[in-house]
């Protein structure tokens, strides 16, 4: 992609972003990001979170999802958030910065979890997007697979997994794998997800 095309694309994205009703509403409500509204819509439909739950938030920064979940699980619940990027603290959320593919970070994460299993894993992880589908989609699928792999190891029986995926090559196979391990699997496209984006959210409940 030429620099001129990238520049035009960037300008269009910025214009859309600042005119976006969810961005405006997020600023009014002092929310970390517009992603809060995506999770709110999904949770209103699928009833994922309950008081007292133990939740792991992957790809958490800047904290929109953690901000939503910590209010849902309450004081008796627990939220662990993890991201490569730094994240400002949120009351009730334990944040780890790093890549869980690294042994040292994975060890810290498992120490935070302790003997208790996780009720829900949520992942809004996304790669640095290039705008080239043949590059972006395999990268996003790789992140979704990593989230899926760790979920299988740490979720309680009957636990839930919510993950962002970009539709394209590998998507149907990923869905089949999810359906083999969870009792119920749904694909959601919340209103706050931009129409042009290939992103969807897979809600998997009832780990077998």
UniProtKB/Swiss-Prot annotation:
GO terms for cellular component: cytoplasm. Disulfide bonds: none annotated. S-adenosyl-L-methionine binds at residues 63, 65, 83, 99, 124. Keywords: Cytoplasm, Methyltransferase, rRNA processing, S-adenosyl-L-methionine, Transferase. It comes from the Bacteria. It is found in: Cytoplasm. It catalyses: uridine(2552) in 23S rRNA + S-adenosyl-L-methionine = 2'-O-methyluridine(2552) in 23S rRNA + S-adenosyl-L-homocysteine + H(+). It is an enzyme of class 2 (transferase). Its EC number is 2.1.1.166. The keyword Cytoplasm applies. GO terms for molecular function: rRNA (uridine-2'-O-)-methyltransferase activity. The active site is at 164 (proton acceptor). Pfam families: FtsJ (PF01728). Specifically methylates the uridine in position 2552 of 23S rRNA at the 2'-O position of the ribose in the fully assembled 50S ribosomal subunit. PANTHER family: RIBOSOMAL RNA METHYLTRANSFERASE, RRNA METHYLTRANSFERASE 2, MITOCHONDRIAL. Belongs to the class I-like SAM-binding methyltransferase superfamily. RNA methyltransferase RlmE family. This is Ribosomal RNA large subunit methyltransferase E. It comes from Hamiltonella defensa subsp. Acyrthosiphon pisum (strain 5AT). The gene is rlmE.
């Amino acid at each position: 992609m030429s620099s001129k095309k990238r520049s035009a694309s960037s300008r269009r994205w910025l214009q859309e972003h600042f005119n976006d009703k969810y961005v405006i509403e997020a600023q009014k409500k002092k929310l970390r990001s517009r992603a809060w509204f995506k999770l709110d819509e999904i949770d209103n439909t699928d009833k994922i979170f309950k008081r007292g739950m133990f939740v792991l938030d992957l790809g958490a920064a800047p904290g929109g999802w953690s901000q939503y979940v910590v209010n849902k699980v309450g004081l008796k619940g627990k939220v662990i958030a993890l991201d490569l990027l730094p994240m400002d603290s949120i009351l009730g959320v334990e944040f780890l910065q790093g890549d869980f593919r690294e042994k040292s970070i994975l060890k810290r994460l498992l120490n935070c979890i302790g003997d208790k299993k996780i009720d829900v894993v949520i992942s809004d992880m996304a790669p640095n997007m290039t705008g080239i589908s043949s590059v972006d989609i395999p990268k996003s699928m790789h992140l979704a697979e990593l989230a899926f792999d760790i979920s299988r190891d740490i979720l309680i029986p009957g636990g839930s997994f919510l993950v962002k995926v970009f539709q394209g090559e590998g998507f149907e196979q990923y869905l089949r794998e999810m359906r083999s391990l969870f009792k119920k699997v749904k694909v959601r496209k919340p209103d706050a997800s931009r129409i042009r984006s290939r992103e969807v959210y897979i809600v998997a409940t009832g780990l077998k």
